[in-house]
Amino acid sequence: MANEFRVCDDCKAPNLKTLIPRLKKLDPDAVIKIGCQSYCGPGRKKTFAFVNNRPVAALTEDELIDKIAERLKKR
């Protein structure tokens, strides 16, 4: 089963122009869904993504990518 990344295009913290290519690099076969994730509170302060329906958040995009990579290794 392919991994799924969900990211928000409304929140202020995630920069989709840089985040999506980095997610594709982590897992080229993953499904990436873009749209509101109803995670507005944290999404204003931290960059985040949902990885296989689990939220992952960090203060920077680099930290987020590291956390997502760890999450994928556990799978």
Swiss-Prot record:
Note one Pfam family from the annotation.
DUF1450
Query: Which residues span the membrane?
Result: none
The UniProt entry, under InterPro entries, shows: DUF1450, UPF0741
Q: Which domain of life is it from?
A: Bacteria
Record-stated family = Belongs to the UPF0741 family.
Q: Which HAMAP family match?
A: UPF0741
Name of the protein in its database record:
UPF0741 protein GK3412
Protein species of origin: Geobacillus kaustophilus (strain HTA426)
Species lineage, top-down? Bacteria, Bacillati, Bacillota, Bacilli, Bacillales
